[in-house]
């Protein structure tokens, strides 16, 4: 019977080959309308770098720390924490929806300080998330579902590229406020205040807690104070993104200053945290999302809804990275070592900034490069124009994003002179 049916099929298509007949009988594609998406701008830089055979090539696009030999760096405190965890021979059972409790508690304590009134009163809730991106998305989903007063979220201009799709895909309406001043490669306080004064009440405003990405430009404490007062006057909901605590200045308290100050001034903030950079746990995806509430009862209600949001997305977070971070944060000797290592990473980046400016002067550059050392954190907005970036890529095999942002973590004692020479060549 099967053979009969097969022969009928073949005869019905006349002189066509059996292969063509089978292809015609297949269902048409469901996905003919799907267009090819654009490549990720950061990953595209890395792919081009990999194809380059120039021995002097530099990849200044990727936001991951490198040591002074240009190699990936695993912290000693992380290795020791891993050894302690392995020795315990722990199980691999599911974590609760909200994550590892020891981690969540230590995570928010690191951000707010262990003696913060918010923690003592129990009026905050922290859930473990899938690093900073996961934290932002859970936060965006929460705001989208429960902040009925406004669908608008105001991002600094510019902001981290992923902020836009995270909030957009959560159903928020994207707006912007002035932040960066291209003429000075610094912070535009007047522009920021002017724009914030016009933001409709109860809108959401996103703030980078420290080491603004991509510019490396942070407000000074007195500027933060002006912003906090105006934001409170405008009755805006503050969403802090803190991906670089300790990694910016080398001091965890200094880097968390803005977050703590806003809370002191009565802002019930949302807070996203990541341990990718400051613990080097990039692939472990360790983060936290915190909501500061009116009181403990409100915090419990918020927690219940966060769990409901998390459950259909990833059910519960991964445990290994959270165990590592919790072990470091809760073990005094490891915590002390980690603080030293964080400062060491931050200090190396600061030193590379200084060496770059020094070598630019040696090259004879007459441009003002003070913004390179004024900026803070992993990234530097160089002020280079797109055509200058193209020359750096094509003539010197120095790869970066088109906006002139460089990852200072990719600069080393061995290649900083070459970088300065190349920048001078395209800017003189």
Swiss-Prot record:
EC annotation from Swiss-Prot or TrEMBL: 2.6.1.1, 2.6.1.7
Q: What happens when the gene is disrupted?
A: Morpholino knockdown of the protein results in brain developmental defects. Morphants show a small head and seizure-like electroencephalography spikes. Additional defects include slow circulation, bend body and pericardial edema.
Q: What is any one GO biological process for this UniProt entry?
A: biosynthetic process
Residues that, per the record, bind substrate: 63, 160, 213, 405
Gene3D superfamilies, per the entry = Aspartate Aminotransferase, domain 1, Type I PLP-dependent aspartate aminotransferase-like (Major domain)
The transit peptide of this chain lies at: 1-27
N6-(pyridoxal phosphate)lysine modification sites?
A: 277
Q: What PROSITE patterns does this protein's entry cite?
A: AA_TRANSFER_CLASS_1 (PS00105)
Q: Write down the InterPro entries for this protein, in alphabetical order.
A: Aminotransferase_I/II_large (IPR004839), Asp_trans (IPR000796), NHTrfase_class1_PyrdxlP-BS (IPR004838), PyrdxlP-dep_Trfase (IPR015424), PyrdxlP-dep_Trfase_major (IPR015421), PyrdxlP-dep_Trfase_small (IPR015422)
Q: Which GO terms describe its cellular component?
A: mitochondrial matrix; mitochondrion; plasma membrane
What is the catalytic activity of this protein? Answer: L-aspartate + 2-oxoglutarate = oxaloacetate + L-glutamate; L-kynurenine + 2-oxoglutarate = kynurenate + L-glutamate + H2O
Q: State the needed cofactors, names only.
A: pyridoxal 5'-phosphate
Output one GO MF annotation.
L-aspartate:2-oxoglutarate aminotransferase activity
Which UniProt keywords are present, listed alphabetically? Aminotransferase, Cell membrane, Membrane, Mitochondrion, Pyridoxal phosphate, Transferase, Transit peptide
Q: Where is the protein found, in the record's own terms?
A: Mitochondrion matrix; Cell membrane
Cited function: Catalyzes the irreversible transamination of the L-tryptophan metabolite L-kynurenine to form kynurenic acid (KA). As a member of the malate-aspartate shuttle, it has a key role in the intracellular NAD(H) redox balance. Is important for metabolite exchange between mitochondria and cytosol, and for amino acid metabolism.
What is annotated about its quaternary structure and interactions? Homodimer.
Q: What else is known?
A: In eukaryotes there are cytoplasmic, mitochondrial and chloroplastic isozymes.
Family membership:
Belongs to the class-I pyridoxal-phosphate-dependent aminotransferase family.
Q: What is this protein called?
A: Aspartate aminotransferase, mitochondrial
Q: Which organism is it from?
A: Danio rerio
> Which lineage ranks, top first, belong to the organism behind this chain?
Eukaryota, Metazoa, Chordata, Craniata, Vertebrata
């Amino acid at each position: 019977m099967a053979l009969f049916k097969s022969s009928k099929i073949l005869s019905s298509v006349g002189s066509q080959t059996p292969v063509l007949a089978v292809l015609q009988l297949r269902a048409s594609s469901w996905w003919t309308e799907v267009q090819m998406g654009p490549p990720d701008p950061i990953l595209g830089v890395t792919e081009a770098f990999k194809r380059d055979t120039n021995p002097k090539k530099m990849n200044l696009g990727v936001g991951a720390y490198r040591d002074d030999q240009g190699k990936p760096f695993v912290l000693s405190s992380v290795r020791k924490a891993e050894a302690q965890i392995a020795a315990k021979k722990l199980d691999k059972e599911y974590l609760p929806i909200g994550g590892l409790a020891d981690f969540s508690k230590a995570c928010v304590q690191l951000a707010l300080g262990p003696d913060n009134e918010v923690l003592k009163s129990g009026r905050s809730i922290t859930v473990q998330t899938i690093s900073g991106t996961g934290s932002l998305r859970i936060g965006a989903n929460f705001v989208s579902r429960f902040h009925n007063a406004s669908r608008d979220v105001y991002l600094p201009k510019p902001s981290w590229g992923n902020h836009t799709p995270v909030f957009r895909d959560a159903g928020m309406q994207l707006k912007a406020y002035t932040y960066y001043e291209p003429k000075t490669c610094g912070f535009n306080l007047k522009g920021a205040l002017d724009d914030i004064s016009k933001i409709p009440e109860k809108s959401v405003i996103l703030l980078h807690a420290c080491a603004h990405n991509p510019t490396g430009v942070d407000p000074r404490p007195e500027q933060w104070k002006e912003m906090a007062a105006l934001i409170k006057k405008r009755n805006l909901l503050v969403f802090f993104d803190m991906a670089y605590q300790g990694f910016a200045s080398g001091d965890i308290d200094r880097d968390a200053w803005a977050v703590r100050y806003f809370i002191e001034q009565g802002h019930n903030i949302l807070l996203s945290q990541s341990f990718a950079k400051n613990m080097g746990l990039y692939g472990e995806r360790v983060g936290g999302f915190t909501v500061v509430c009116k009181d403990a009862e409100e915090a419990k209600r918020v927690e219940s809804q966060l769990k409901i949001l998390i459950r259909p997305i990833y059910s519960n977070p991964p445990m290994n990275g959270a165990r590592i971070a919790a072990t470091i944060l809760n073990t005094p000797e490891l915590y002390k070592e980690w603080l030293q290592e964080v400062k060491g990473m931050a200090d190396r980046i600061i030193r590379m900034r200084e060496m770059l400016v020094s070598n630019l002067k040696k090259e004879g550059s007459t441009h003002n490069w003070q913004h390179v050392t004024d900026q803070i954190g992993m990234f530097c907005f160089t002020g280079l124009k797109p055509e200058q970036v193209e020359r750096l890529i094509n003539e010197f095999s120095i790869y970066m994003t088109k906006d002139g942002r460089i990852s200072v973590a990719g600069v080393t004692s061995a290649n900083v002179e070459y970088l300065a020479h190349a920048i001078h060549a395209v800017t003189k």
